[in-house]
Every structure is written in C-alpha cells, then in structure tokens.
C-alpha cells in the first residue's frame, strides 16, 4: 500500500516545481565548477548531489581561491582586487563557527574587492545549511569570470562565453544579435593576459546537432516548434530572427541565455507553446523513434494556432450519443405521460359543522398529493437529454382563479374524487395496475347531515347502513381513508336507485324559474324589512335596565365546529333538553328562525324543525314581541351546564302574524325527509 505522506510530499514538490528541467542547468553548472576547482586545487569534489556544497561548507577552498585571484591581480598590476582574505585553514568542521567565519569573509571579499552584483550574492546559511545552492553556483561563476580576465583557468561555461564573444566580434552583422546579449558578451580583459580557450573538435559539433534534433523530436505535435540551424552551434528559434548559441557540456545541451546558461529542454519548455500548455512534457520522457499512433507514446497535444488534422471535422459534428447506448447507461426508460392526461385533483370543500382542524386536514391531503405530482413532474422534466422520439409533454394550462361565490355554488354539488394514491402513482402490482388503467372511473359519495349536526357518507350504489362512519370530520374520500378502514367497493352505479335518492342527501340547489326566483327574493326583502321594524319597535318599549351578561362559553364551545350546532339550536330543534329561549323578563318564548351561515347558503331548504315551527306558531297564535332573546349555548346536554336560565311563561301576542317568505317557500317546495335506512 502506497504511503499517503509520500504522495502528499510528491504532489507538493510538483506544485512548487512545475518543470523537472528547471533544475537541470544548476546540476550542469555544479559539475562544471567541480571540475574547475579540482583542476585548480586538486580537491576531488564530487559534481553531483550534495557533495559539492558539502566540500565547500568549511569555506577554506573559497578563501584560498580569493587569495589566488588577489595574487594574479597584483602580478598584472590590476586595480582590483588589492587585498586578500585571512581565514582558518586547519581543523575546521563543516557548520562550525570557524566555517561560518570563513564563508562570511569570502562573501565580504566578493562585495568589497570584486564588486559582484548583489543579485548574484549568497548568504552564509545558503552554503552552510545548503538552503539556496543556485545562488552559490551563480556567485562562483561570476568569481570565475573575474579570475579568467586576470589569466586564471576558467570553467568550461566561461570558456564557452569567451568563444561566443569572439564569434560575435568576427561577425560583420552585429545588429542581428540582441542588445542584452551584446552587453553581456562585452567583457573587459586585461591586456597581455593569455586566453585559455579550449578548441571544439568536429566530433563535438556533430554530436551537438544530433542532440538538438533528438530533443526537438520528443514533441509529437504535427507542427513542431521551429529551430533552424544557422551555423555550427548557432540556431534561429521560433518565428522571429532570434539567434541562440548552443553548446554541449558533458551530457547536457546548454543554451546561452542573457548573462547565464540554461538547458535546451528547459528553454523549450518555457518558449514552445505546445510544451507550455501540455503537462506531458513536464516529466522526463524516453526518446521515441518514428511517430506511430499505435505505440504507447505521449498523447499529442495540439498547439494554439495549428489544429490537429481532422479536428475541424470532429468539432463541426455535434457529439450525439446513440439511443441504444443511452438506454444501457441510464437504465430502462418508462414512457412519460403528459400532464393533461392526469386526472384533476379534488378541491377541498368545507361544510357547515366542520372544524378548522378538519378543514386543514382536508386541505393537507390534496396539497400533499399535488406536491407529489409536482415532484414527479419536475423529475420528468429534469432530464434534458431525452431522445426526441419520446412523446413531448404538453404545456401546462394555467389554473383559473376560483372565487368565493363559485365555491359556494359548488358546495351543493356532489363531490367527485379520483382514484387513490396507489392507483395514481404505483404500477407494481397487477391490482394497482388495473386500478390505474380505470382511472377515469370516479366514485360518488353521498353525504348527509344528522339532526345532531354530524356528517356521514355512503358510497353511491350501497344500500342499508353503508355509512363509512360519522364524526366531526371532512367527508371522507378514498385518498383520506386510513389503511385499516374498509374501502367502499366500486360497484356498478344503479340508475333507478340513484333516481330514488332524496334530493336532500345530495343537497343540490332548487331549479326555479327566473320569475319565481325574483319573487322569492322580493319576499325575503319584505320579511327582512318587517323584522327590522319589529326589532326597532320592541327596542323602543324596552324597560330601563341592563341585560344580564351572557355566561363565558367554555373552550369546547369556541371552535367553529359548534357554530352550526348553535345555529341549529337557535333555528329550533324539537325534543332536545335545555333549548328553551330566554327573554329579558325570564319568560320562555318561541324560537326565532335562524339562517345558516355556512351550510344553507347554497340551498333554499330550512332546518328539519322549520316546517313544524311554522305549523305550531300558526296554531298557538301570534308571536309575542321579543325584546332580547338569546338561546342557550349548550350543545352537550350530558354535561352539567355552568348556568341554567330560569324558564318563564310565554306572552300572548296581541294580533295575528302572517307567514313569511320562508314559510311560503316551503309551501312551494315541500321538504322530503331522508330515509330512515340512511
């Protein structure tokens, strides 16, 4: 198993040094300086690795060479240097205080006597602790150049510089050489000093051209970086007229760059656009022969401005994945169904007697189903890479705003609910698959209201006691049923039985002619005005006295579920205990008819005891004038009431009272009592 720490260290080294060839020229310079010092002082310094800096860490060799340069300057009567270096030569350990003192003395001599530029200087720690070997190498090369002017033996790189200088002086067209290179090549030499420039053999030049072609051949691009040979060791690179001088130093191909040297590999890595953009050239590569796409050679990377042949054809043609491959990658695709074919979701409708909690639960069902459908719709629309042969989804139709009057008219209509959730979404089992295929078959529920204000439902086509249950809840649908509750069987809808069902169960609005409807509205207005006048007349004869405060209702009576029951008590139900009215003087009086605010808005029918009250009031005589009447707010007779009003005898009316428009309406459309079986 690979060491993770080593992997991290390797990646860090790659991030710090993006080019492996950037350190090659430092190694080449170290080898050249080691040969130079070994030839001068017979030291035996290794040229590779850390052995070169380790041999110079005591500072003894550096101070010895400084004194040699000073003696050569004195012999030639040169102006500089004038003073040597005093140092400790015996029993000096690397890294000790004396070693640091020797290195510091050499650095001071370079600054003061030779005038080495500060950019080429190094610090004591750079040599003793081997922190910055590049600065040490560059400083030693500059010291070697200054010593070569005084007649001392120079390293091979300095000899190459002197040779290039003579070649440039012999060339008549000096303008072709860059100005920066001219400044570097102009090296002042002391007159009378013999030059020790080694001669390059023809074998070296022949090997140089072969090595250059080999390095250029490592790039596998069709259009390689141009490097044209002008003369022996002189090349023109790129599209410009820039000339570079190339020399061979041991196993390295060196290029004269500005005032220093660089390897040809590193130079091409920085100037060749193909090598700069490709990461494959940043690692050491083996030499490859003829280019063959079948061999395991590095992948050719196209240069900017020179596209690979055939790339136009590949780029102009869009990449299209075959449908068969997509099916294998993405799995089997299920045919999508347009959203218009999905059955509409049922709207939640609040009936009279329903509490707020039941209404919210009724809304949570369809809303949850709608969110599921929207989620599935978004999943259907998410993959944009579907084949065009699939059935496109039709655009969504905007939902029209629904007003309150429309909702009130829809309250009296029979509620239609689609199939259950399992029939809409799941198609795993055969029963659910059959149910989803018959999605258009819709169940009709018949909802009725009992005398105590409770609702019960039965499925259409069921006889007898088919009520699914009663309670203060919303009319149950197959979606709202719990798993434990039995589902009503979806049988064939019998036509005669549906026709024989009383209209009060469906609570459909009465179909009247426009003339009868206007006449009914006119009677209602007249009755309303008459009642208002009677209330004003009764209020004028009210004795001076404050009416007793009503008792504080219990929290169980504050919910909207008891509002309809309270209205039904005020509307007049027979046989219920504690339903006697209360007047200002404590006498019980007949109950006034109350209009239902929720359940009877869309239906012209009255409560169950409406017709009986009309008959009783006509037999008993005219109604007494009511000053202040308030019904008992108690819908639970089994519990002990908090306050029971004192019953008193009714007053005898002074004159007969005529029937109102509501009684006339019952004469037009008599109410049909629901079946006892329901």
From Swiss-Prot:
Subcellular location: Cytoplasm, Cytoskeleton; Cytoplasm, Cytoskeleton, Stress fiber
Domain GAR: 203-275
Record domain Calponin-homology (CH): where: 27-148
GO biological process: cellular response to starvation; microtubule bundle formation; negative regulation of microtubule depolymerization
Residue ranges with Polar residues bias: 276-291, 666-678
Sequence positions bearing Phosphoserine: 306, 316, 352, 355, 394, 436, 438, 482, 489, 493, 654
SMART domains: CH, GAS2
Residues the record lists as Omega-N-methylarginine modifications: 490, 507, 630
Pfam families recorded: CH, GAS2
Compositionally skewed regions (Basic and acidic residues) per UniProt: 327-340, 370-381, 404-413, 437-454, 631-641
Positions of post-translational N-acetylalanine modification: 2
GO cellular component: cytoplasm; stress fiber
Region Disordered: start-end pairs: 276-524, 538-678
Biased amino acid composition, Pro residues: 485-495
Keyword Disulfide bond recorded: no
Biased composition (Gly residues): 461-471
CDD domains linked to this entry: CH_GAS2L1_2 (cd21268)
Subunit structure, as described in the record: Interacts with MAPRE1.
Protein's name in the database: GAS2-like protein 1
Organism from which the protein derives: Mus musculus
């Amino acid at each position: 198993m690979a060491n993770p720490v080593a992997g991290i260290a390797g990646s860090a080294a790659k991030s710090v040094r993006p080019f492996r060839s950037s350190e090659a020229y430092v190694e080449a310079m170290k080898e050249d300086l080691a040969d130079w010092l070994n030839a001068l002082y017979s030291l035996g310094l290794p040229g590779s690795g850390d052995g070169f800096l380790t041999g110079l860490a005591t500072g003894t060799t550096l101070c010895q060479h400084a004194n040699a340069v000073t003696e050569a300057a004195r012999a030639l009567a040169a102006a500089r240097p004038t003073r040597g270096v005093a140092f400790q030569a015996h029993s000096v350990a690397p890294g000790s205080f004396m070693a640091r003192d020797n290195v510091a003395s050499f650095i001071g001599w370079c600054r003061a006597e030779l005038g080495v530029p500060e950019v080429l200087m190094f610090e004591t720690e750079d040599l003793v602790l081997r922190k910055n070997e590049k600065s040490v190498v560059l400083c030693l090369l500059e010291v070697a150049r200054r010593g070569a002017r005084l007649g001392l033996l120079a390293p091979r790189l300095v000899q190459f510089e002197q040779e290039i200088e003579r070649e440039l002086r012999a060339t008549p067209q000096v303008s072709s050489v860059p100005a920066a290179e001219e400044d570097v090549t102009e090296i002042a030499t002391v007159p009378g000093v013999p030059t020790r420039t080694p001669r390059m053999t023809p074998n070296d030049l022949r090997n140089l051209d072969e090595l250059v072609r080999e390095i250029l051949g490592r790039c596998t691009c069709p259009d390689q970086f141009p490097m044209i040979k002008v003369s022996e060791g002189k090349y023109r690179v790129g599209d410009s007229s820039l000339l570079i001088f190339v020399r061979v130093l041991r196993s390295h191909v060196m290029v004269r760059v500005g005032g220093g040297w660089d390897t040809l590999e590193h130079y091409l890595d920085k100037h060749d656009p193909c090598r700069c953009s490709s990461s494959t050239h940043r690692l050491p590569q083996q030499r490859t022969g003829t280019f063959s796409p079948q061999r395991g050679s590095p992948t050719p990377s196209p240069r900017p401005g020179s596209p690979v042949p055939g790339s136009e054809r590949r780029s102009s043609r869009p990449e299209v994945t075959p449908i068969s491959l997509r099916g294998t990658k993405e799995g089997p695709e299920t045919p999508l169904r347009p959203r218009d074919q999905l059955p509409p979701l049922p709207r939640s409708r609040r009936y009279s007697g329903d509490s707020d909690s039941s209404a919210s639960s009724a809304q949570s069902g369809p809303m949850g189903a709608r969110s599921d459908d929207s989620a599935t719709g978004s999943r259907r629309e998410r993959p944009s890479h579907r084949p065009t042969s699939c059935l496109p989804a039709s655009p969504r139709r905007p939902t029209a705003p629904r007003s309150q009057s429309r909702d009130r008219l829809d309250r009296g209509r029979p509620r239609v609910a689609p199939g259950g959730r399992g029939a809409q979404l799941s198609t795993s089992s055969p029963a659910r698959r059959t149910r989803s295929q018959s999605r258009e078959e819709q169940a009709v529920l018949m909802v009725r209201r009992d005398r105590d204000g409770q609702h019960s439902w039965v499925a259409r086509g069921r006889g007898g006691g088919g009520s699914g249950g009663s309670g203060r809840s919303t009319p149950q649908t197959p979606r709202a049923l719990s798993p434990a509750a039995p589902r009503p069987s979806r049988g064939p809808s019998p036509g005669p039985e549906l026709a024989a069902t009383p209209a009060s169960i469906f609570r459909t609005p009465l179909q009247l002619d426009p003339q009868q409807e206007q006449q009914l509205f006119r009677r209602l207005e007249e009755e309303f005005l008459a009642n208002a006048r009677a209330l004003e007349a009764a209020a004028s004869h009210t004795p001076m006295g404050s009416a007793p405060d009503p008792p504080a209702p219990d929290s169980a009576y504050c919910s909207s579920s008891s509002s309809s029951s309270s209205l039904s008590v005020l509307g007049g139900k027979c046989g219920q205990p504690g339903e006697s009215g209360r007047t200002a003087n404590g006498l019980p009086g007949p109950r006034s008819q109350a209009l239902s605010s929720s359940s009877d808005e869309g239906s012209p029918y009255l409560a169950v005891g409406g017709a009986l009250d009309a008959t009783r009031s006509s037999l008993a005589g005219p109604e007494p004038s009511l000053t202040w009447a308030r019904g008992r707010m108690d819908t639970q007779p089994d519990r002990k009431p908090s306050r029971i009003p004192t019953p008193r005898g009714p007053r005898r009316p002074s004159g007969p009272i005529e029937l109102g428009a509501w009684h006339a309406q019952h004469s037009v459309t008599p109410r049909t009592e629901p079946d006892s079986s329901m």
